[in-house]
Design a protein with these regions (language model features):
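ATP-dependent phospho-/nucleotidyl transfer catalytic cores
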Residues: 169, 199-202, 206-304, 315-423, ...
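Low-complexity, flexible helical/coil segments
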Residues: 182-187, 341-345, 613-614
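Hydrophobic residue at the +6 position relative to the catalytic HRD Asp in the kinase catalytic loop
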Residues: 307-312
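Regulatory N- and C-terminal appendages and interdomain linkers associated
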Residues: 3-113, 118, 347-671
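Short, surface-exposed, polar/charged, turn-prone segments marking secondary-structure boundaries
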Residues: 174-177, 197, 335, 341, ...
Length: 671
């Protein structure tokens, strides 16, 4: 039988094992953060304010009940020098990877940070459900911080229980690995562990609580330090009245900044002997990485639902997968967080929110930066973002040989057509590689007809567009604003969110039009829009071959670039939901199937290049199951309903009709 090498008490004690250590037990920990930054050594139990520290030690583990491995990511484990076989052969793996048993060399702790949440400073937040284990040196893959999400109460748990449930853990596990496979900087997820411990949750915010399984994700990143890590030094906020737990401790702020630059931006440290110059170069690099990151999000239709400063990585990673979503139909106003009633973190708002968060980071760094120079760097953000964005979009359209002034307008017009036709974002881009090269004089309509037919299959029906255009504002609130616009225009102009009202009115206008349009008429409009755009796209493609005779090479390059930048698979909500429902019944096979597809988002196949015998048969069976699962299809009808509310679409009511033209007048809108 397996001997038990580690005894857990409070404080945690470690005894030398007489057994041969497993691969997990041989991980080489360095734990630099705890050596270089102030650590709270208090043994006071429970949540509390933690001044003058960047971390708090976790003195007692809170084991899960009968933890068991649900899924492993071989590619994430490889970053630690581990294989899935190593982990599965370790009888204590589930305990180690859920924070139920301390790994040799690890030093459990929780990170202290603050944050601006939905635009307001929230004071001390911190790792309320996350336990830092340490930093592992893995040779060729460098150093990785590892932590367990869902490990129990920490000093930063506030009113929470420190647990994560199976539902949210599956989503984080799959999305972490999906983003990495897409080539987007992200934290990684090495394992998903579930258990027989249950907690009470209200998943629909309906007042109805249910019992859900506690689960844990082992996360990896070069660092989990975030913008909010520097906000613990913030003085009292004039609006919220809150302050950071280490307000005024400029010495610790300098220590944290030095640590981040030395460990994660060593090139900047080496290039600058002057501290202020070094810090400005650091801030510029953080700005650049953030701009590039959000550009990558936008180009795969990803939306981060809680884009607060505490969820912004200081090293430019996608961090903390709470509410998130990959768009199905393209909608610039797409909101993936049911709590985001005002759309602060909508798809189209994400770049400007990232810039806003960078401004809060500059404030937090204070005298470490030159204020005027920091503002100048912030002013470069949108141009930097737009350059990265257009560069990626050119690749998605196969425009790789030339950069034309018209390209930006071509992309904007494409998105406009996708929006008004309700086209599926991922599948439409994937189909554009089938647009024929403009090399003969045949009729445009005849030439592009087949690909237009394929794209039309990805467009929305009238009923789907009605759902899309339903006003997101509560009916009573909208009625009050509409009434105010008619009875007191001056108060309306002062008190209301004119932009938000205009967006709601635009939805009402589109909804009204849809009730006057039948499906056949809609399809004709959609076809005409796509034929017109594809005609413009082919004219632009023709410019790619100016000055060269090797048309075959150009075509080959175009297809190669497009197929490596337009994924076939993304983590759609229904894919995650199917995996969740199966897992809640004890079947983890769907998580593993989804992971296998998401690991190769640009590929039509999923297995190794060659396999023999039994492995080949298993791989073929797995590929057949993945193909049948239809991960590259539009979402099924049930998935197109809002996950939080049952949407019943009716024609615009009399109240909306009565005030529609009055408010259009006062907001300057027309349809």
């Amino acid at each position: 039988s397996r001997c038990i090498p580690w005894v857990l008490t409070a404080p945690v004690l470690m005894e030398t094992s007489q057994c041969a250590p497993t691969a997990l037990e041989r991980l080489l920990f360095h734990n630099t953060a705890l050596k270089k930054l102030p650590v709270d050594e208090s043994e006071e139990p429970g949540p509390r304010t933690v001044p003058a520290a960047c971390y708090s030690r976790i003195r007692a583990l809170q084991p899960l009940l009968r933890p068991n491995l649900a899924c492993l990511s071989p590619s994430a484990l490889a970053l630690l020098g581990l294989s899935a076989h190593d982990v599965r052969c370790d009888p204590l793996a589930a305990e180690y990877m859920s924070g139920s048993r301390v790994l040799p060399g690890s030093e459990p702790a929780a990170h202290c940070y603050c944050g601006h949440q939905f635009g307001l400073f929230a004071g001390q937040l911190g790792d309320g459900a996350v336990m830092y284990l340490g930093e592992v040196e893995s040779g060729t893959h460098g150093r990785w911080e590892i932590q367990v999400k869902g490990a129990g109460v920490t000093p930063y748990s506030r009113d929470g229980d420190g647990r994560k449930v199976l539902r949210s853990s599956i989503r984080e596990f799959l999305c972490s690995e999906a983003m990495a496979a897409l080539g987007i900087p992200s934290t990684r997820a090495a394992s998903l562990v579930t258990s027989d411990l249950y907690v009470s949750r209200d998943p629909l915010n309906s007042g109805r609580r249910i019992r859900e399984r506690c689960s844990a994700v082992l996360r990896l990143a070069p660092s989990f330090i975030r913008f909010g890590s520097f906000e613990i030094f913030r003085g009292r906020d004039g609006f919220s009245g809150l302050q950071g737990p280490s307000a005024g401790r400029d010495d610790i702020r300098a220590q944290l900044l030095d640590y981040v630059i030395e460990n994660y931006y060593p090139g900047i440290k080496q290039a600058h002997s002057n501290r202020k110059d070094r810090n400005m170069a650091f801030f510029r690099e953080v700005m650049t990485r953030t701009a590039k990151l959000v550009a990558q999000w936008q180009c795969v239709g990803f939306c981060h639902g809680v884009l607060n400063t505490d969820n912004m990585s200081i090293v430019g990673l996608t961090l903390d997968y709470g509410p998130f979503g990959f768009m199905d139909r393209f909608d610039p106003d797409f909101i993936c967080n049911a709590s985001d009633k005002r759309g602060r973190y909508s798809y189209q708002a994400q770049p400007s929110v990232c810039r806003w968060n960078l401004a809060r980071l500059a404030e937090a760094l204070g005298s470490e930066l030159d204020a005027a120079e920091a503002r100048a760097i912030l002013d470069e953000f949108m141009a930097t973002y737009e350059a990265f964005y257009l560069c990626i979009m050119r690749k998605k359209l196969g425009l790789v040989r030339k950069e034309e002034a018209e390209d930006s307008e071509l992309v904007s017009d494409l998105l406009r057509v996708m929006h008004i036709t309700g086209a599926d974002f991922t599948n439409t881009f994937h189909l554009l590689s089938r647009v024929p090269w403009p090399e003969d004089d045949s009729s445009d309509k005849a030439t592009v007809g087949p690909v237009v037919d394929l794209i039309l299959d990805q467009c929305a029906s009238t009923e789907e567009l009605k759902v899309t255009n339903k006003p997101t504002m509560e009916e009573k609130e909208l009625a009050m604003i509409l009434s105010m616009a008619q009875t007191d225009p001056v108060m309306f102009s002062m008190a209301s969110d004119r932009t938000g009202v205009a967006q709601q009115l635009e939805r009402i206008g589109h909804l009204k039009d849809l009730f006057e349009t039948d499906q056949e008429e809609l399809k004709k409009k959609q076809r005409d829009e796509w034929i017109r755009w594809i005609r413009q796209y082919r004219k632009r493609l023709a410019k790619e071959c100016d000055g060269t005779d090797d048309l075959h090479l150009i075509k080959k390059q175009r297809l190669c670039v497009m197929n490596s930048n337009n994924p076939r698979h993304v983590l759609r909500n229904y894919i995650a939901q199917n995996a969740i429902e199966a897992a809640e019944q004890g079947d983890f096979s769907e998580i593993n199937r989804a992971l296998k597809a998401l690991e190769k988002p640009y590929s039509d196949t999923f297995g190794p290049e060659s396999l023999d015998g039994v492995d080949a048969r298993r791989e073929n069976e797995q590929e057949e199951k993945i193909s049948k699962a239809g991960y590259d299809r539009k979402p099924p009808a049930w998935a197109q309903k809002n996950l939080y509310h049952l949407i019943l679409i009716e024609p615009p009511g009399q109240l909306q009709e009565r005030y529609l033209f009055s408010v259009m007048h006062h907001t300057g809108r027309s349809f």
